[in-house]
Amino acid sequence: MRIDILTLFPEMFAPLEHSIVGKARDKGLLEINYHNFRENAEKARHVDDEPYGGGQGMLLLAQPIFDTMDSIEQTKPRVILLDPAGRTFNQAYAEELAQEEQLIFICGHYEGYDERIKTLVTDEISLGDYVLTGGELAAMTMIDATVRLIPEVIGKEVSHTDDSFSSGLLEYPQYTRPYEYRGMVVPDVLMSGHHENIRKWRLEESLRKTYQRRPDLLENYNFTAEELTIFEKIKAEDTVD
């Protein structure tokens, strides 16, 4: 995968040189290019101006963004504008982006964008219902969530297919050594070696956690017959409590 990032602050992306994303680059599975669009600004390197019609703040000029985009080698990329008004990013979106050959992120600053910039864009994405100073932190979050889903980036595919949200449910509780710590012990089923019982326990705990913490995820969830039986049991237990 190739990722191009338009930003005024390339140095903010230093963390992408490390961890999973850095390893993906070392393996040749990922190429990341940074483009400081201030370098393409025409008037005294200014990248922003006051909005027509008045109003607070400054807007990013269209010209530096367009000229920078013209300089990037493109192979039918998804062009992503980081915008609080955009579609909310989630795991399903990350899985969708992981299938692409090229992603381009446009990171804004200041009050907003000249609307004409959006003619370059295929996706407007937000991390949530809040506003950040710029798009860089949002872009790094999306890149990390997406890159780890690229085949061969993580050693075992199960490492991410069992993640919270990948199945549509939150992940079940997990434990490691020691068996007992400060009076807290590992559930006996996990020590039993009985793989089918362990699978059923994990499924039940995953459904329980999702029901208790993120019931909204279950509104459109396609239950299997087994899951539905377990879920009805969980709801009945909750009613009794």
Swiss-Prot record:
Family matches, as SUPFAM superfamilies: alpha/beta knot (SSF75217)
Keyword field contains Ligase: no
InterPro entries: Alpha/beta_knot_MTases, tRNA_m1G_MeTrfase_C_sf, tRNA_m1G_MeTrfase_TrmD, tRNA_m1G_MTases_N, tRNA_MeTrfase_TRMD/TRM10
Binding site for S-adenosyl-L-methionine: 108, 127-132
EC number of the protein: 2.1.1.228
GO terms, molecular function: tRNA (guanine(37)-N1)-methyltransferase activity
Protein's job: Specifically methylates guanosine-37 in various tRNAs.
Protein name: tRNA (guanine-N(1)-)-methyltransferase
